[in-house]
Structures are given as structure tokens and as C-alpha cells.
Amino acid sequence: MVKRSAFHPATALLFSVLLTATVQAAVLPGNPVISRRAAAESMALLKNRNSTLPLIPADRVAAFGHGAVDFIGGGWGSGHVKTEYNANLNEALERQAEAGRIRYCPEAADAWGGDSKFRPDAAFVNHIRKQADTAVLVISRCSGESKDRSPGAGDWLLTVEEQELLQLLKKAKFRKLIVVLNTAGPVSTSELTDDAVDAILYASLPGMEGAHAAADLLTGTINPSGKLTDTWAVAYEDYPSSKDFIRTADFQEYEEDIFVGYRYFSTFDKEKHKVNFPFGHGLSYTMFEIAAPALSHENDTLVFRVPVTNIGDRSGREVVQLYVSAPQGKLGKPAMELAAFGKTRDLSPGERQELTLRVPLAQLASFDDTGRSGHEGCRVLEAGDYRFFPGNSSWDAIMHSPVLFRQEKLQIIFRASVRLKPSLLPRRLTADGSREALPVIRATAEKTVEIPHDRAIEIEAENFTAAHPNTGIEKFGNQGRRELRCVSRMDHRGRFVEYTLTVRQPGRYAIRFRVSNGRPALQDIMTCEVNGIAQPLRLDVPSTGNGPVRGEWYNFITLAPVTMKLPRGEVKLKLISNGTFINLDSFTIAPAQQSDVLFAAFDREHSRIPLPGFHKRERRFPPNGKIVYGTLRRYPEQLDAFLEQMSDDDLAQLLGGHAGSSHGSAGSLGACDVFEIPPYDTFDGPSGVRSFDSCTSWPCPALLAGSFDPELAETIGAALAREARLNRFDIWLAPGVNIHRNPLCGRNFEYLSEDPLLSGQMGAALARGAASENIAVTVKHFAANNREHRRFQTDSRISERALRDIYLRPFEIIVKEARPLFLMSSYNLLNGRKTAETPELLTGILRDEWKFTGTILSDWGNNSDHVYETLAGNTVKMERGNPAALLEAMRHGELTRGHLKRAAGYLVKSLLQVQLMREKQIKPAPDILPSPPEAGKLK
């Protein structure tokens, strides 16, 4: 038996171990059945020319492509799930043939089974054509953590081999040519839109049973009802974010602003020239009539009742998508925005259902970040006519007659308590197609520094008077009330900073730089120019590494001095990067002849002295004895006393993660034996329990969102949670709700959609489902984590409006609707600051505005500083903390014991709720109808 806690005997019964069997990862019975059904409910039928599908018993089917025998169930990285099997389409079609739904020729797919590099020629294809009249071509693409997708062949585009095979299949004139896209996200479909290709099924990364689900749809055993959660453009270059997504720069300029995905195309591509398949698109084998909604009001919510009738000859489900076209007002709006959605039950031919869709008025408001409405820093509902269009896709909706709601006057919905304005985003797209210039703060106010002849003087690196436009200023801490900043992002030859000096006494001066270098040692990092003349000096920088107090990027050291000549009068000192650079905090200048003495005097005057009288707190147990963790269950009001008895060391240790105690754990929280806090284990991933042994692989979240069915998402969340509990886990590191800004983000399959409402509501449903089966969730990655390339360094430069209306919106929905216990900050920078070190984001918005009371985890192994994380409101540093840095910061007054207690309080309250979950019995799986073809829809 694996021991999960070290409780005092008096509290052992209170915190009894849930399971006594040996820990062993396992697939919960029934979960593969749910996985298959969920995949089928989520896949989207993109094209079905002349009712090619569903296949019929007379169809003689052959499958082509390596993907037919190596069907991809999920991505790599945190999204990878080890499974007992991963069904492929070859075997799935064979099962359909055994059931009499088709006739199947396995010879084609078998050719790839024996040789993954098999390259068929015309003779092979024609040979198969004699046996089969229906060709199913499978195109597979994977994706994963730490690497983005490519716009080239083999990813967005077809490979040469795939193009050749497609042409061979077209020339062979199969009666039916069907393409199954087993891909991590959108790919180019321009070669598939001609009449030679009869049908396209988007299967995405559908989990271990996904191939069977695809076969169920191809044969009509299940009627497709999934929809696209992203816009599929004609060319990659048609996406507005494509111009800077794949470049190597350490920043992304979100110049498209709020016009992400279909918001962009509906506004600027009204002729529909740039889109092959729109957001929300997905066909059915039957037909539905969506009638005009009836509108009513309930307090501050608009209520739409939408009648839906199956007017076809097959049973099926339909998604009603309600879009709003808001008045342009003074702020400008996208042409269309998803306002609500709902999915019918399985409707028989002729059957009718009325869906009720609710739209809070607050949801229609826009954030005014520049004051155009007269209310800067507020979310406002502008006056005018709001037109609502129901439909089954973003294109279909606009064909329906609108329902009008009139807002008589501007209404302030919300006033922001903090601001997150960008400093380096020069412009943004507006609704009329023009670019609005934004204030760019490239340097501090121009300042001339006078160089004395009798002492040393320090110049802060950020006090430059000119700089390369991509040079950054990065906050790395506080000293009292003063923010500490450094110059960063000069890792390209030619980037520079320039300082204006006034020199009264010309001559040779010594200059020493205070730098941090998290890389291996660097040689000759910069060229120094004085009034345009390069100085004969060389600056080498050792690796500063991870110091006892600061992380690798802020562990500043002072280099040995170098010398240069400075003339009398105004001097322009220019520091030019020779390539790979460092973080530059400051530099000190003194006359060279006396530099040793003057630098020593400067150091004595500015030395970092511990607070007078500071003593590290040791443990102080109350008179009635030690309060242990279990006591808090009955007496939660003792939380402050519980924390107060801890030493500073205890608190610092508690604010870092620990090794996991379960098989395959990503790491644990708690684990303080002295106070009997057990370890609580976290686990990846978004598509299933990521363990060392086999578990269920589910449809990836991006596919699951295509179901447009929150009830189904709750079912998946609950089923996954039951399996996680069986495998002795506590905290799920999901859902991820970052927006699909660009189709090539490597982790898009882990996230949900390009739309914030769909992402938020489906993410909230997953969270509710998991919580219903006593697994806590961790919403991630907060925020704007939309690229994997150089993910530790990349800076997402976003306007405050786009941030609040698009990129933060899914997190806000989940925090308010599902009340998760945990949230994870992201690796990236947001408007020049690391998210885990940004108090405006973690405390101002998340806690103060949204009232989040849970625990904020850093992402695993990030390069943020633990001290500044704690000051910002990040609760626990994963997967390991830096307690020495926290204690050192307390010695020097940067942190107080109160900071540590506050963070520990959030953590302990969260863990107590996890403990309550842990103690509850694992519920048996609910009655689940067997997988098709044996049964109807999942309940």
C-alpha cells in the first residue's frame, strides 16, 4: 500500500486513505465506450457532395494513406496518453464490413502497414480500383508541446507524396472519393474543394476509439453533428496573425486586435473569398429548419427561444448558434460574434424541439481602453441596435432574418481596478480596416547624465535616450516602492541602447556593467561607440546561472571594468549587440585613474544591507499544543493560528512543489510532515490521465469543443476524473483555454477554440464534470500563451481591449461559472512582463475583479523569479520552489512574512477542499448505452 499521509493518530480516522489496494494505473470500464461516442459527436463533416455519405452496404471501400493504419489519437507532450491500443481506420472499416454496412478491401491499407514509406504508383491504385469503387484517403498530422506546426509541406500543406496519391485517386475515377483529415487542427483544403473529392470528414485527434467513431460516421451508424471550432482559411497567409507568428522574434504583435478567427473574416472578407470552411460549419445526413427566435427579457438577460425541426429523413442532432452584430458605436465591433449556442437532442424526422438560449447584457459589452466612449478603463454597452442571427454556422446565420434588441443609452457594465496597457504595440486593426496608432513607450523620459570627475556614478540601463524599436524593458523586482527594471530582448545583432552623457573633464573612464546571463558563457557581446566611434574594448560574460536568491535571468553580477575615452561636452554612448545578449541592469562609470578607489567607495555606500534586527522566525506552537492540518476540517477558523505556528522555513517550503507520490504524477503540493499535510498529486493531461501505465485516451479538447455540447463535456470531465481517482491522483492540470489565435500553435489541440465564449463554456463544463467526481482542475495557461516557439521568452503584445474581450474571457467564464480550485500562470511575457510576476494580472484581475480564491501555480520549470512571483500573487512555484530566495528576500525587506502567509493560506484552503474530495468514495460509472451501432446517443 502506498502511504498518502503522515497523520497524527488522533486525526488518522478523519483522513482515512481512500483505497487500500496497490496503486496501479487502469482504464475505468466503460470509458472507451464514452470516448468513442464523444468523438463521433464532435467530428465535423465538411463536405458531402451529392450525398456521397453515408456509405451503403453495396459500397466496396478501400482505405489509402499511412494514416489508415497509423491513425493518430492524440498529440505529444503533456497531451500524450499511454493507451492499451489506438484503433486505426483499417481495422475500424473491417469491423463495419463484418456488420454488413459496407464491403471492404483491406489490401490497399495493408500496403502501408508493411512499409510506412510505401509510395503507390498508378498500377497499384488501378489494381485496387478493380476491387473497390470507394476510396477513403486518410491524411494525418500530429502536434504537441514545445514546438509549433509548420506552414509548409507535411503540415499545413500536403506532402509531395500525398499530392501524388491524391492525383492518382482522382484519375482512377473511383465512384466515391472521401478524405478523412486526422489532423491536430486546420490544414490546407484547397486541393480538396474540387468536384473530384466527394466528401471530407474532419476527425481531428479523436482518442483511442477515434477511428471507430470515424467509421461510425462514414457508414451513417451515427449522424454527424460536430462543428468546426476554428475558421479554415483558403491559404495560411489569409490569417491576420500569419505575418509574425512563425518569425523568430521574441515577441508577437497582436495587431489584429479583437479580430481573431471568424471575427476577422466576417468583418473583412464579406465576399467569402478567403475561407473554405467557416467557424461553426458541420454537415448532417438530415436537414433541419431553424425558425425565427422569440425574444424575451429576464432581468439583465436576453432570452431567445429557438424552434428547431428535423425536416429530413434521418434522426440527428443540430447545433443552433446565435450570433450578434453589435452597433459600431465609437469603439467599433466585429461584424459577427457568437452570443450563445445550444444543441438539440436526437430528433426523429419531423420532430421539433425549442432551445432556450440566454445572453446576459453584460456579455455584449466591449472594453474601452483608450477612452473613445468617454469611459476609459470601463466595459461599456454602447447604445444602438443589436441584431441577433440564429443559424448552424457563422455563414448560415447571416442568411437568417435578425431579431433586434435596442439599447437606448450607453451603460457602464464594469470599471477596471487595474490596467494592463501594452508599451510596445505600435498599432492595431480597427473595424473600418484602418490601423489605430497606440502609444509606444520605448524608453524612459530623455535624460542627460552628468559624469562627475571625482566619484563613481551608476546609470540604470532602462534610462536610455534612444533604442532599437525591439529593445525591451523588463521588470524584475522591487526595492521598497521602487520597481527594478533591466534592458532585455537584445538578442539580435544590431539592436542597441544609447545614453546621453555630459562630460566636464575629458579623459579615460572605467565602466563596469551589471548583467545576468542564463546561458553558457558569452564572448564579445557588444560594440561600444562613443559619438559614433567604436571603442577598442571586448566584453565577455560568464554564465551567471541560478543563484541562491535569483533565477538564471536575474542573478545579476558586476563585471570587471573596461575603459574608454570620453570627450568633453555632450556624449552619445551607444551599446550595440553583437548577437546573443544579456539582461543589463545598470552600469557604473568612474575616472579610470582612480577607478579602484571610487568603485570601492560606491560599493560601500550602496551595499545591500539586511534589515536591522531581522531574525528568521522559528516554529511557535500555541500553549495548547501544535495545531495539525486535520484540525482545520472541524475548525477552519484556526487557519491563521495554524499558519502562525509555522517557521519562515516551513512557509517557504510550502510555497514550492514536490516530487509526486503517485505513479506518473507531474508533481505534488503540500507534503509537510511536521504539520501532517499530505502530498496531493497533480497529473496531466488534456486528453486523458497521463500515467506510466495505460489509461483512456479521449478526443482532444479542440475536437470535443466541436460537439458544442456542454453536457457531453461534463460527461467527459466526470469519466476522466473517475479514472484519475482510480489511479490515485488529486489535481488535473487542465483544462487549457488559450485562444486559437493562429492555426499553427503546437498546443492548439489541447485548447478549445478561436472563440472565447465557446472556449469558456466548454472549459467550464469540463471543470464541473471533473469536480462532480471529486477531482480538482487547474485552468491554464494564464494568459495569452499562444505560441510554443521560444515559449519562455516570447512577449505577447496585446491591447487591453483584446486582452479583456478575447484572451482573458475564457478564464473569466470558468472562474465565475465553475469556481476552480487551481489556475496556472503561463511561461510567456504579457506586454513586456512575465505573467507569473504580474500583480495586475494575478491579483488585480484574477483575485480582486473576478474574486478567485483558489491557488495559482506557476507553469513547470518556468524562468520567473520566485520572489517576484510571490509579490505578484502567484501561490506555488512548480515543480520546485526556491525557499532560499524567499528567505533572503525577507532578510532584505523585499518580502514580509505576511506575503508568505497570504500565499500559504490560499494553498491550504484549496488543499482542504481537495482532501474532502479525496475522502469521498469513487462512484461507479453511470449506466452508459453501448457504443454504436448498438445504441443511440450517449446520455
Regions found by a protein language model. Give the residues of each.
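Glycoside hydrolase catalytic-domain context in secreted enzymes
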Residues: 1-7, 21-390, 394, 425-452, ...
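Bacterial N-terminal signal peptides
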Residues: 11-21
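Sterically constrained small-residue positions within well-ordered secondary structures
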Residues: 16, 253, 281, 297, ...
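Short, surface-exposed linear segments at secondary-structure transitions and domain or protein termini
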Residues: 238-241, 346-351, 409-417, 544-553, ...
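Short amphipathic beta-strand/extended segments with alternating polar/hydrophobic composition
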Residues: 342, 399-407, 537-541
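Short beta-strand elements
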Residues: 396-418
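Extracytoplasmic
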Residues: 442-608
